[in-house]
UniProtKB/Swiss-Prot annotation:
It comes from Candida albicans (strain WO-1) (Yeast). A lipid is attached at C285 (S-farnesyl cysteine). The modification Cysteine methyl ester is found at C285. Required for the regulation of both a MAP kinase signaling pathway and a cAMP signaling pathway. The activation of these pathways contributes to the pathogenicity of the cells through the induction of the morphological transition from the yeast to the polarized filamentous form. This is Ras-like protein 1.
Length: 288
């Protein structure tokens, strides 16, 4: 399917907008002036080895058609701003046309091309080539002088506008691509930060679990410090030698405690007998 370009020809009355358009489409010059309200023309052509379809809208230059012109401007992709080199007034009008385009398109950058028409009327020139070029530079767009009568730079003007549209679209696409890449980079950076934060949280959680496990192990092993001191709750009841064996199983500790109980009972009995003997000696009496 052919790429279609919607071109709008804008300028004051009598500058040769229709003559330029008809010369491009039909390759002949219209000598008489017939004020245009709206004419649309289509032409298939080859530009830079690409088959394209030009949809050219020739608009009215009269001020009374300003509202209608705004409607045409909304649909246009690119604009030919045409003045006549033998009319200073038509040259000065281009500023208002350009401002109207920017306002309607709601943009500060629109594909346009400034055309100084009727360059065959050199003896009647009122606008110098340098002034036309300076105006185009202020619009940041190309500039050509044309002659619809002598078919000078007619195709170049329309084709140049198409190239300007392509350059404009390429810049827009590049800007959108860069913006998308920046957004992707920001998302990647944010994802990396989230992963790093999650990793730190996991490490902290593992560390806390390890501390809790160590505390639980100490409680199970009798609550004894490294020097064999029983904890404040009196748990454990084991000697310092047992405290140095934190990895003993519970059954082993019970066996050791059972072995110590008979020995402790014998010691208690011996201590009781000794105390009874002492009391007998101290409690004897003498009969007189």
């Amino acid at each position: 399917m052919l790429r279609e370009y919607k071109l709008v020809v804008v300028g004051g009355g009598g500058v040769g907008k229709s003559a330029l358009t008809i010369q491009l489409i039909q390759s002949h010059f219209v000598d008489e002036y017939d004020p245009t309200i709206e004419d649309s023309y289509r032409k298939q052509c080859t530009i830079d080895d690409q088959q394209v379809l030009l949809d050219v809208l020739d608009t009215a230059g009269q001020e009374e058609y300003s509202a209608m012109r705004e409607q045409y401007m909304r649909t246009g992709e690119g604009f030919l701003l045409v003045y006549s080199i033998n009319s200073l007034n038509s040259f000065q009008e281009l500023n208002s046309f350009y401002d109207q385009i920017l306002r309607v398109k709601d943009s500060d950058n629109v594909p346009v091309l400034v055309v100084g028409n009727k360059c065959d009327l050199e003896m009647e020139r009122q606008v110098s080539y340098e002034d036309g070029l300076a105006l185009a530079n202020s619009f940041n767009c190309p500039f050509l002088e044309t002659s619809a009568k002598q078919r000078i730079n007619v195709e170049e003007a329309f084709y140049g506008l198409v190239r300007n549209i392509n350059q404009y679209n390429a810049k827009i696409a590049e800007a959108e691509k860069q913006q998308q890449q920046q957004q992707q980079q920001q998302n990647a950076n944010q994802q990396g930060q989230d992963q790093y934060g999650q990793q730190k949280d996991n490490q902290q959680s593992q560390f806390n679990n390890q501390i809790n496990n160590n505390n639980n192990t100490s409680a199970v092993n009798g609550g004894v410090s490294s020097d064999g001191i029983i904890d404040q709750n009196g748990n454990g009841g084991v000697s310092s030698g047992q405290a140095n064996l934190p990895n003993q199983s519970q059954s082993q500790r019970q066996q050791q405690q059972q072995q110590q109980e008979p020995q402790q009972q014998s010691e208690n009995q011996f201590s009781g007998q000794k105390q009874s003997s002492s009391k007998s000696k101290n409690g004897c009496c003498v009969i007189v």
